[in-house]
Amino acid sequence: MVSEQEILESYPQVCPSGSLSGTPGNLDSEQEAKLKEFRELLESLGYKERLDDSTLLRFLRARKFDLEASKIMYENCEKWRKEFGVDTIFEDFHYEEKPLVAKYYPQYYHKTDNDGRPVYIEELGSVNLTQMYKITTQERMLKNLVWEYEAFVRYRLPACSRKAGYLVETSCTILDLKGISISSAAQVLSYVREASNIGQNYYPERMGKFYLINAPFGFSTAFRLFKPFLDPVTVSKIFILGSSYQKDLLKQIPAENLPKKFGGQSEVSEAEGGLYLSDIGPWREEEYIGPEGEAPKAFQL
């Protein structure tokens, strides 16, 4: 079995110069000292895994480099990982119903943006919870969410980092609200709330860019009202767009990487799994796959 250290050594561990403050390669002396202190603290508590710079700095950034708050967050995450069975999720969980679920709630990764990030697309406006819950459960959907997060961390990011030539830590997300109604939004609220909790608490600082497209009338106004109460760094990553979103997406995502349905040129044949199931990106390209191996799939076509 390949060790965590071998995998870390196989791809870049430093973000580009000028990246967000507090990321690997973009630390001031105080942040450097906090990182060292944080690692020593966790080692003294018996932790041996997930102590690399990138991981520890994400927890520190999420808690504004407050050592005690970062420690609590890290400990809660490790406790949750053990209880949820995260370390063996690839062996234990198989989402064979995914091809059917994708028809009622499309969620998928597709290629990369201009900064080398994996592009994650979720078509929330297409959700049909009534049909979906005939073939799966919210519990299994959340298991799949964690499965995808782990694939993102263990396979997608290393491959994207090798291709980019620097450390890629985040995703570029497109959330499509086309066709969403109050009733469908209310239906999926419970899942979205739980999914958000998992992302914020256990996979912090993974959002690079977030595009909310086909936003209903008034959504942008509401967001502007809440902006003063949100973290400025978070706000800088979020873009609320209506139906004329194509130019904005193409500024961040190359046309050849953006699906045709969103204004790009990328098309995928059904033989390859179609847009929803093909999972195309550097993590499927042999030259960028390292000792971790190719990203697994939770289902068989």
From Swiss-Prot:
GO annotations under biological process?
A: protein transport
GO cellular component assignments? Golgi membrane
- Name the InterPro entries on file: CRAL-TRIO_dom, CRAL-TRIO_dom_sf, CRAL/TRIO_N_dom, CRAL/TRIO_N_dom_sf, PI/PC_transfer
Q: Which UniProt keywords apply?
A: Golgi apparatus, Membrane, Protein transport, Transport
Where is the stretch described as Disordered? 9-28
- What SMART domains does the annotation carry? CRAL_TRIO_N, SEC14
Q: Where is the composition biased (Polar residues)?
A: 16-28
Q: Which Pfam families match?
A: CRAL_TRIO, CRAL_TRIO_N
Which superkingdom? Eukaryota
Q: Where in the cell is it found?
A: Golgi apparatus membrane
Membrane topology of this protein: Peripheral membrane protein
| Domain CRAL-TRIO: start-end pairs | 97-270
Function, as annotated, reads: Required for transport of secretory proteins from the Golgi complex. Catalyzes the transfer of phosphatidylinositol and phosphatidylcholine between membranes in vitro.
Name the UniProt record assigns to this protein: SEC14 cytosolic factor
Which species is this UniProt entry from?
Answer: Kluyveromyces lactis (strain ATCC 8585 / CBS 2359 / DSM 70799 / NBRC 1267 / NRRL Y-1140 / WM37)
